[in-house]
């Protein structure tokens, strides 16, 4: 899942700036002409942050440890103009994850609210306009995701989309028009019988490419789906393994859609064309971080990715993906030989459950037999004891 404390911004000049929150300090690292990243501390006492670009400005929104909510803007990533949207003393913003969508005359804010009494989480919307906040609007109940509790993307000047977990095993999308505020219907995208441990979504022209990781009883799966219009295509299982999978990522490279993930810390990929034709699994041979993370990627006018992989050991520098790959020598041991339908996946799960149930039944039968033997032995000893005990004579 996305790490909410690291984000990547593609600048108009074409380089990538890295924003990170470390020990309540908000840092920006921008690449210099010699390829190094120069750190610059933007603010201290920060508990969380959000990042976006609008027109010629970059915006940072961050709650502080004393309860303030600050909106800061910059045109060069060096000189920042902080502006308080909420003054000190309100604890609601501490550690609150937000998604923002600024406009010329309004500021739109989406955030999660926890209700300690009930344990519920609510996705809310608030509008800041003409110097004051409008009453918040409750969008939906949701279950926070690991890392970033929910994800938000801007699809246009007046159009955003939210991704969040609407049920225990369902990741859904909801499109929203900002002005006038119009809430779209909920659209389930990912539904798994196991646990969805990570997902990545790329909106590309009229298609939505969905890649996710599913963990079941004894294996991990990498699954791809394509949404075109309102129809979500069938799931394709790209990879199955008993080892751990993480950091799935969808990105566009020229006219190809790349489906990327790590299996047992090894980078893998498939090439997808038109959302239907999927090539073989290949192992990536380019240098890849030993300790990696995934962060939000923002700012490309022609978005080729919505996330990026960074290096924990090298100040979160973005990993550079190249075309260096090699086919797996024995793909049948790891990857699915062909895209399998979700029915096959369910049948495998049922077979595993039947096997597990049979094993447990045998264990229970063995325990029952052991206890029955012990009970029979005790009953025999009790009967023998009663026979050997003399009967008292009540006659005077």
PLM features per residue range, with description:
Residues 1-396:
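Extracellular, repeat-based ectodomains that mediate carbohydrate processing or recognition
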